[in-house]
Amino acid sequence: MISTCITVAGSDCSGGAGVQADLKVFTAHSVYGMSAVTAITSQNTIGVNGVHLIPASYVEQQISACLLDVHCEVMKTGMLFNQQILKVIVESIDRFKIKKVVVDPLIATRKGALLVMPDYLELFVKELIPRAEVLIPNIAEALIILKHMTNEFVEIHHLEDVKAVGKKLIKAGCKNVVIRCDDIPFASDFFCSRETNMPPTWYLYVLCTSEGEVLLPQKWLASKTARGTSCALSSAVASNLAIGLDLVTATQNAVSYTQRALEMSFHLGRGANSLDYASALTRLPYEKGEFINFVRYHPSITPKWLSIVNHPFVEQLKAGTLSRLPFQKYLVLKYHMLINNAQAAGMMAFSSSSISAIEHSAKIIQAIKEENVTHLRICEQYGLSASQITKSKPEIVKSHSLFIHDTAQQDGLRGIQIAMLPFVFMIQEVVSQISASDGYPYVAWVEHCKDKSATSHIETLLESLETNSQIISLSKVQHLLGILEKSLDFERLVLDTSSSNESSVF
């Protein structure tokens, strides 16, 4: 069933913000979007020159028309304008049992000028914030809300000050907060660049939860100013929650989407740039949780995979008739390819500006390190010394190194994980079927491939790919299939090289 989301916000006739922007974002994430308009505005890329409020009763009528007909568990709110409309929203959340509410406050400009009346702010804090799954204010709004809730004020000089604001908001009653540091560029040391005279490096997003803070720095784009970035971010978070992602992943993906939309923004009118909301436009050819099955059984993949499972090496491995030398060659080649994967993950971490991507790269490296320790021990059991394994790199290993490094540079963590799938398939569909009974020559290797440590690493890799497979373009899916095809070619080449009497591996 298709995921749904409703936005309650103002209308922007020029399409750059408001419900028009929200609906574009929903569509780009393959989420069916509905809307309730709170005001009709006359605006363009230069500015707003007219606002016509919709009566609160008619806002309620719009919401009811949608939600009495279509099941929806996620709501995104934008500009609500007055107390009457705000009360309608609160009542609708309760009436329709909306599970997750994403709130873009829109109570102040980036400079901190208040856009709403004090009585609105009072009701906003008292009634809407407690119902919000996540609040997504700019830093000025976060400070205003904090002042209202706790009478505290924090001066922003460094990243740690932003985190402090988030912690205080959580302590004051906000469930989760994503702070957008609009108009404040940060230097490479995470101090405000305007105070240190250092060149701007980072645009900061900070996700704050009861469990801690997640820093999501993005490259500062000095030449890119565009309308609708808050709409894009909050609607992307709502979309990701609607398709079932957890909040951290939903926010990470939303930040990446917003950054990409900003990077690809274009000059359409005479004022600010227009975001490329369609930068992730896709109708994915698989359902949630079916990405791995989709790529495994894709028509371009199946013939290559069959050429592997029907390879004489694999047939003999399953039967227990594979001689020692081909198996030794296979172990050596697999060792080098694991090292290549670890090096590519390390290179990706070194060049990444995303803390979460660095963390995931580190996990891959740690998993490969643990695997290699066991792998070397197994190699020794089958008559291979450490010097035999490491002293030289066959040509296939050098070619694989170029491939996996290029993949890491172009496609990051997801590309590396896709390139690791052939061996995952080998374990799942070949090794798991081998009965390593008495007399089977490679019991230690089979048992290792089946043990809890190995299967746990595989499960983590597959879960990561599934989680991140909902927010990619169709062209990216095709590109990833291309990576998998090349990786399967290398897997086949490993089998050919291991089986060949003419090839030298050690």
UniProtKB/Swiss-Prot annotation:
MF terms in GO: ATP binding; hydroxymethylpyrimidine kinase activity; phosphomethylpyrimidine kinase activity
Known pathway: Cofactor biosynthesis; thiamine diphosphate biosynthesis; 4-amino-2-methyl-5-diphosphomethylpyrimidine from 5-amino-1-(5-phospho-D-ribosyl)imidazole: step 2/3; Cofactor biosynthesis; thiamine diphosphate biosynthesis; 4-amino-2-methyl-5-diphosphomethylpyrimidine from 5-amino-1-(5-phospho-D-ribosyl)imidazole: step 3/3
Binding site for 4-amino-5-hydroxymethyl-2-methylpyrimidine: 43
Entry coiled-coil feature ranges: none
Catalytic activity: 4-amino-5-hydroxymethyl-2-methylpyrimidine + ATP = 4-amino-2-methyl-5-(phosphooxymethyl)pyrimidine + ADP + H(+); 4-amino-2-methyl-5-(phosphooxymethyl)pyrimidine + ATP = 4-amino-2-methyl-5-(diphosphooxymethyl)pyrimidine + ADP
Chief place where the protein resides: cytoplasm
Annotated localization: Cytoplasm; Nucleus
InterPro entries: Haem_Oase-like_multi-hlx (IPR016084), HMP/HMP-P_kinase_dom (IPR004399), PM/HMP-P_kinase-1 (IPR013749), Ribokinase-like (IPR029056), Thiaminase-2/PQQC (IPR004305)
UniProt keyword terms in alphabetical order: ATP-binding, Cytoplasm, Kinase, Nucleotide-binding, Nucleus, Thiamine biosynthesis, Transferase
Any one biological process term the GO annotation gives: thiamine diphosphate biosynthetic process
Pfam families documented for this protein: Phos_pyr_kin (PF08543), TENA_THI-4 (PF03070)
Spans traversing the lipid bilayer: none
Role: Catalyzes the phosphorylation of hydroxymethylpyrimidine phosphate (HMP-P) to HMP-PP, and of HMP to HMP-P.
Family: In the N-terminal section; belongs to the ThiD family.
Name the UniProt record assigns to this protein: Putative hydroxymethylpyrimidine/phosphomethylpyrimidine kinase 1
